[in-house]
From Swiss-Prot:
Residues 319-328 have a biased composition (Gly residues). This is C2 domain-containing protein 5. Residues 1-109 form the C2 domain. Phosphorylated on Ser-197 by active myristoylated kinase AKT2; insulin-stimulated phosphorylation by AKT2 regulates SLC2A4/GLUT4 translocation into the plasma membrane. Ca(2+) 3 binds at D78, S81, D84.
Amino acid sequence: MPGKLKVKIVAGRHLPVMDRASDLTDAFVEVKFGNTTFKTDVYLKSLNPQWNSEWFKFEVDDEDLQDEPLQITVLDHDTYSANDAIGKVYIDIDPLLYSEAATVISGWFPIYDTIHGIRGEINVVVKVDLFNDLNRFRQSSCGVKFFCTTSIPKCYRAVIIHGFVEELVVNEDPEYQWIDRIRTPRASNEARQRLISLMSGELQRKIGLKVLEMRGNAVVGYLQCFDLEGESGLVVRAIGTACTLDKLSSPAAFLPACNSPSKEMKEIPFNEDPNPNTHSSGPSTPLKNQTYSFSPSKSYSRQSSSSDTDLSLTPKTGMGSGSAGKEGGPFKALLRQQTQSALEQREFPFFTLTAFPPGFLVHVGGVVSARSVKLLDRIHNPDEPETRDAWWAEIRQEIKSHAKALGCHAVVGYSESTSICEEVCILSASGTAAVLNPRFLQDGTVEGCLEQRLEENLPTRCGFCHIPYDELNMPFPAHLTYCYNCRKQKVPDVLFTTIDLPTDATVIGKGCLIQARLCRLKKKAQAEANATAISNLLPFMEYEVHTQLMNKLKLKGMNALFGLRIQITVGENMLMGLASATGVYLAALPTPGGIQIAGKTPNDGSYEQHISHMQKKINDTIAKNKELYEINPPEISEEIIGSPIPEPRQRSRLLRSQSESSDEVTELDLSHGKKDAFVLEIDDTDAMEDVHSLLTDVPPPSGFYSCNTEIMPGINNWTSEIQMFTSVRVIRLSSLNLTNQALNKNFNDLCENLLKSLYFKLRSMIPCCLCHVNFTVSLPEDELIQVTVTAVAITFDKNQALQTTKTPVEKSLQRASTDNEELLQFPLELCSDSLPSHPFPPAKAMTVEKASPVGDGNFRNRSAPPCANSTVGVVKMTPLSFIPGAKITKYLGIINMFFIRETTSLREEGGVSGFLHAFIAEVFAMVRAHVAALGGNAVVSYIMKQCVFMENPNKNQAQCLINVSGDAVVFVRESDLEVVSSQQPTTNCQSSCTEGEVTT
């Protein structure tokens, strides 16, 4: 399918002064695609040139259209010397290759230089004419849509979810080539940016080909990562979920339905909710969009390390308890048989989605993870990346076997990551083992009778909590009780999962962000000795991280974790672990037991007194947390709950039929179940430190909530005021007498102070919630710790939420809190005195932008195809897959950009803070410009996947690499939809257009 690419250079503005004599510039432009280059005329002596060039035409194959970026270089003409480069613009042509997407790219693009940053803007118009080619041997995948969002896009319907797609490409890193010794830093950076752009395009094309082979037309949950392996080379890899999507053409699908989510669900068969509940986790106003996304399920297990499958806390094969009482064994057997046959033909039945349609997940079995330590070697042949492929195949095979051991045949919420230091690389993968409904995996399933069939066979609202394994064949003891909701099937006492909370899950109270942080020193070593030391440390780190999560979850009085993300980072002399998740109280699970401290030194009065004092503090903290998060579950008589799991010696006396019975209740053993306390033994100073660390987490100030999932459980009435922010903080440690305890304290202080500074800066938005909080920790150099956090602050109407969420069960849970105006409850200590040396303050910037009413008015006609003359106000940016108070009407394509910034005058640019802030602000500006040129007005599912910072203070130098991605979309405010809608306007929708962005 060859095509014709047409480019027109219109004008430039705000160019830098390149001729010191005249304080002006003689600018011209080179337009390059592939091996063909065109040049404009030189526009003499102007900082705002008007080229108005002719149309430059490139006749190329569609394979090149997908692989190659359009390069636009702005230069200053010199008569007697080499032309000076002003900057470059890379434009991805891929969004123009979709039949439903934009037909033209037109707008002002920032001219970017890797040394000086943004240096003016250039107005470019790009068009593509494609010729249809049905050649079955073609190497392009034009028309396959890519989405970063990990749920089904809002204005689409999933026909089939095909499954996992992955690919990786390798090459030599230009930064480590011999020619790099003789070329300028600018030339080296630009060679690197161009190569990464080429590899990214090639990767998308290859994944698109795999999707076409599976007869799909889209990739959802697309995650692309760069592995900078130094001298070993450069690896670009990606994973995603292949789907067949249908565009929802019905205008009714986009109408607002503020307080009636069920109205929208009935318009879309995939989202039929057969069992509405007044206190579901999905908010009403923003999540009118969310009804298009898949409702996830939950699971519980410890992460199983690559060497120890038995760490998984969700047991093995067998049918075990079903998902609903009316579903008997025959249906479950048939369901499992169908699903297994549907998934057997797939090598890896993985899904990168974190949200699913109701009924897609039948059961979940637990968090499964695998890690592997590898030694990097040089990539000899870039065309044959078998080594890296084999590494990841091993990891995926292990994940698959872990899931099978848990009685599950699929893994959802799947993700992969790496951590590289010198020659050592840690490969990590994690997901949630699950049993899936085969109807969504086969063709012809989404027809008219789907709603009726779903109502017949769907599990109840608590079905995802029920165990998918046979309780009589568990490889380890676990506490199971009868479900507190249906009281017919067994549930574990705790659930861990890597996916989002289902919109139909019944939760009590609100959720909160729970983090486990851990540092471990290691000796400096080389090659195999280093890899061995890391391998020996990993299992213990995972165990300690898991223990921290369990303790903090119980301290909060909650019983489930969602969105669990564990990151292990390797440095030259230390390993760091950071786990983030959102804790909630699920109504279907038993009330968590308390935490009991047991000492090992009897007959010591002062010690016993200290232990009792600590025990009292823990009990008080649990009580305060239950009040803070409004956790007050209704009392259920223990006779209803059922019996605990028998000991192994008793199991042989029980018949299998008894495990299927939901009516027989044996005598209750009060030593099990919800009466059981979690015992912490204090036998050394490390154990005491662990207990102290439990009590050092300061709760957020009044009016603030935080979570790492898209939506805060228990909060329903969001307003349309949002602020996205990115914060980077770097500290340098002193190597003198550094111990594990001191390292842990410094790391804890760093993360806590980062959160405190965010609460302080966002205090004017109270009451608000920090959603999608994403922490990333890296060790760029010896004794240097860098923490990057991105999140979005969303305000909510607290009074309205109190009125709308009250139910007969929950009236006792609601408190009429009147402390909204109260600010901080903690002393603000942004620079901890305990740090051995000065921490760098965060790269600060307050770029608060307000969308004018005029700009918002332009959104009214956004349902029409974007044209060259269309104007876009402020381009919104959010890590969420939706925009509160708005409807997404069109997806314009994926934004995937990689930038390098280098400076040789670090101190003059404001130090690390000024340098990082300026670079991040420039990245935002370039992302916004590309989205606006496509005719979009927002970026959703935005993520900063990499932020690699390196500095050399002695030479006053620094370098930073940033990789960002997201989905460019067109959205319409619900207030605008009400004007054009023929239906009755809905109420209780706030449509304030104030939105900003805080970059710290």
